[in-house]
Amino acid sequence: MQDHGSLPSVLDVHVNVAGRSSVLGKVKSRKARWSVRPSDMSNKTFNPIRAIVDNMKVKPNPNKTMIALSIGDPTVFGNLPTDPEVTQAMKDALDSGKFNGYVPSIGYLSSREEVASYYHCPEAPLEAKDVILTSGCSQAIELCLAVLANPGQNILVPRPGFSLYRTLAESMGIEVKLYNLLPEKNWEIDLKQLESLIDEKTVCLIVNNPSNPCGSVFSRRHLQKILAVAARQCVPILADEIYGDMVFSDSKFEPLATLSSKVPILSCGGLAKRWLVPGWRMGWILIHDRRDIFGNEIRDGLTKLSQRILGPCTLVQGALKSILCRTPRVFYHNTLSFLKSNADLCYGALAAIPGLRPIHPSGAMYLMVGIEMEHFPEFENDVEFTEQLVAEQSVHCLPATCFEYPNFFRVVITVPEVMMLEACSRIQEFCEQHYHCAEGSQEECDK
């Protein structure tokens, strides 16, 4: 046995090819040591909501039951169950034994056909080849960003807006540029400011309608103006429409793709919100590209990217046809009636509180409330305001700093009515205790 003694600092690397020995080169030896570090991607991943909420140092008032108006999960309180047809569809899929194996990463052809059929319309035709099934709408958004943007390029994101856009983009080395929504115009986009952000590295405009966190619903005319900017600047749109059709009776949801054939659009949706099953993780991407601007490259790219996790849950895919076709319209109506009633109740109660400026929502599951900070000088910002609200009243609302929009807070309107009433009463008590008249406005306070 050959005695190597101590290994040299470099090793000759030999390979035998067809009986001939050749030297490929010198390779430095690796010094064996433990050096396990997190990846750059993990270090760049940042969730504003978690960063703020997890660092809250206050505890709820032990004498008051906690009321969480912060969680965007409609199932939390048990008052908004999905329809029996939806659960029966899942039971049938499970009992059939047909949906237990691997499937194409973009989903069963039959399931994609059902989604295409459900959303097809003359203004925005769809076929199965235009549908990618995903593990929830969040993965749909991730795939869209991954296929459209390279590190160093930028995307346009609403402010206030869903924090996941930033979390996903920055983890991939994509720059986020924030365009403003205008509270005085029911959260319409500041189109002039939006267009000023576009440069040679801009590869995607995210439009979230109906909006989380605002609860706003864009009019047809405003959507057409957004599309005009995208067409003029040749920027594709990622339409986050997970709350599509979840609008109140005085508004109408217009799918963005129905209003333009010029702009290529990737529309993201899913079962989570409208069907009240966020834990089932079923989402989709609808590819609208009637001028073939995306071509095969973007479609192929989405397929390749979807192969990283081999598709969403097969059981839910097996249930999709029944879920989409059999869910009765009364289920959707009842859900929206409840949400509108809660929205009206919450808005009315908070609008009567000095120092607060709620903005009435038109859909989704949220409303935003402005804080007139000059009347609450004890608090530096919305984070301190909401922290103290938890400490004194055991009511938890998300500070809108989580959505890049300070001095507002978001209220979730899915809680049972009795809890909403109690929460609003506690918020009123809190504000009355901390409200101070601004200088020169004593007359207003005496009213």
Swiss-Prot record:
InterPro entries with a match to the protein in the record: Aminotransferase_I/II_large (IPR004839), NHTrfase_class1_PyrdxlP-BS (IPR004838), PyrdxlP-dep_Trfase (IPR015424), PyrdxlP-dep_Trfase_major (IPR015421), PyrdxlP-dep_Trfase_small (IPR015422), Tyr_aminoTrfase_ubiquitination (IPR011715), TyrNic_aminoTrfase (IPR005958), Tyrosine_aminoTrfase (IPR005957)
Alphabetized UniProt keyword annotations: Aminotransferase, Phenylalanine catabolism, Phosphoprotein, Pyridoxal phosphate, Transferase, Tyrosine catabolism
E.C. numbers: 2.6.1.5
CDD domains reported in the protein's UniProt record: AAT_like (cd00609)
Pfam families assigned to the protein according to its UniProt record, in alphabetical order: Aminotran_1_2, TAT_ubiq
Gene Ontology terms: cellular component: mitochondrion
Cross-referenced SUPFAM superfamilies: PLP-dependent transferases
GO terms, molecular function: amino acid binding; L-tyrosine-2-oxoglutarate transaminase activity; pyridoxal phosphate binding
GO aspect biological process, one term: L-phenylalanine catabolic process
Known function: Transaminase involved in tyrosine breakdown. Converts tyrosine to p-hydroxyphenylpyruvate. Can catalyze the reverse reaction, using glutamic acid, with 2-oxoglutarate as cosubstrate (in vitro). Has much lower affinity and transaminase activity for phenylalanine.
Alphabetized PANTHER family for the sequence: TYROSINE AMINOTRANSFERASE
Protein name stated in the entry: Tyrosine aminotransferase
Organism: Bos taurus
